Each structure stands twice: as C-alpha cells, then as structure tokens.
C-alpha cells in the first residue's frame, strides 16, 4: 500500500514537471519556436480552436515563423489571435501564409520573461509540494487505520521527501535553463 502511494505521487510529480516544461516552452525567447503558439486559440466556425490544429507552423529562419492555414478562410482569425496575444509579435499576411518575425528582446522584456519563467516554475513546485502533502496525508491515514506501522510510515515519509526534492530540483533546472536562454543575446 505504501509503495502504491509513492508510485502514484511520483506519477503526478512527473506530470507536474512535464506541465511546467510545456509552460516554459510558451515563453518567447529571441528565437523562433513553434511552441510559443501552444495554447493560442482562434475562432474556427464559431468554435475556439488551437492555432496548432488550424495550420502548420514551420521555422524557415532562426527568427521567423511561417504559418500556413489548412483553410485560407481562417487566415484573418489566426492573424488576429496572434496580434491580440501577449506574445509581442506582429504577423504579416501575404494571402497564402502568415510570416511572423521574432524581434530581438529588449533587456526589460527579457527581465519580464525571466520573471514569468520563475513564476511558472514556482507554480510547478507548488503543485509538486501539494502532491507530497496529499501522499503524506495518505501515509498518516494508513498508520492511523493500522494498515502500516509507525517505522514504515516514517521511512516512507523520508523517502517521499527525497523524491519531492528530486522533482523540485528538476523544475529548478528547467527554470535556470530557460533563464539562461532568455538572457542570451
């Protein structure tokens, strides 16, 4: 039973680290990255639809993205969604494709992006700590119900702390890498 609790907690922590990694990918750096459009939606026949499902996004140059909609009729919706987002980019429409040139980030904008990355990292660490807390509560309940001895629960709690520290360290590394990437000129 203790092993099941630890295994479940680890699965949830792994998912939290992955979610944090995906969140960090959406933060714009000075380079073109199709992942920056993850989570961006546009109207598609009245239904909010992710842009990544409405068009192919390619990177022909290090600082340019090419967005080719599957249907020309949604070109303006995609263009407006990008323009109205907080990404700080301005697409140009040539009738066939949207070209998005990624401007160099100013020092101030880089600092803002680093703050955003740290915030997303902190959210990930909070999620991991909440998972640990729930697992600890389950362990205490096992002890209270008499399904596990005190020594077993104490050992499991120590192991849970080690596991949690490892996952928090992973999130810290992700944030540090993103920060380094952002501050690189």
Swiss-Prot record:
Keyword Translocase attached: no
Source domain of life: Bacteria
Entry's transmembrane regions: none
GO MF assignments: ribosomal large subunit binding
This protein's UniProt keywords: Cytoplasm, Protein biosynthesis
Gene3D superfamilies found in the cross-reference section: 3.30.1360.40, Ribosome-recycling factor (1.10.132.20)
GO BP terms: translational termination
Annotated disulfide bonds: none
Compartments where located: Cytoplasm
Endpoints of the signal sequence: none
One GO CC term on file: cytoplasm
Pfam families (UniProt xref): RRF (PF01765)
Keyword presence, Plastid: no
PANTHER family cross-referenced by the UniProt entry: MITOCHONDRIAL RIBOSOME RECYCLING FACTOR PSEUDO 1, RIBOSOME RECYCLING FACTOR
Family statement: Belongs to the RRF family.
Record-linked HAMAP family: RRF
Biological function: Responsible for the release of ribosomes from messenger RNA at the termination of protein biosynthesis. May increase the efficiency of translation by recycling ribosomes from one round of translation to another.
Protein name: Ribosome-recycling factor
Gene source species: Corynebacterium aurimucosum (strain ATCC 700975 / DSM 44827 / CIP 107346 / CN-1) (Corynebacterium nigricans)
Gene: frr
């Amino acid at each position: 039973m203790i092993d099941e609790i630890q295994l479940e907690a680890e699965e949830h922590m792994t998912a939290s680290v992955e979610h944090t990694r995906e969140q960090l990918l959406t933060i714009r750096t000075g380079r073109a990255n199709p992942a920056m459009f993850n989570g961006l939606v546009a109207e598609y026949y009245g239904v909010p639809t992710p842009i990544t499902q409405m068009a192919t996004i390619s990177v022909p140059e290090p600082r340019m993205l090419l967005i080719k909609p599957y249907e020309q009729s949604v070109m303006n919706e995609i263009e407006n969604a990008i323009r109205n987002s907080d990404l700080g980019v301005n697409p140009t429409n040539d009738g066939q494709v949207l070209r998005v040139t990624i401007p160099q980030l100013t020092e101030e904008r880089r600092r803002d992006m680093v703050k955003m990355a740290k915030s997303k990292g902190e959210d990930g660490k909070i999620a991991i700590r909440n998972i640990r807390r729930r697992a600890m509560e389950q362990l205490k309940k096992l002890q209270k119900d008499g399904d596990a001895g005190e020594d077993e629960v104490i050992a499991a709690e120590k192991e849970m702390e080690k596991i949690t520290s490892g996952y928090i360290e992973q999130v810290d590394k992700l944030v540090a890498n993103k920060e380094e990437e952002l501050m690189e000129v």
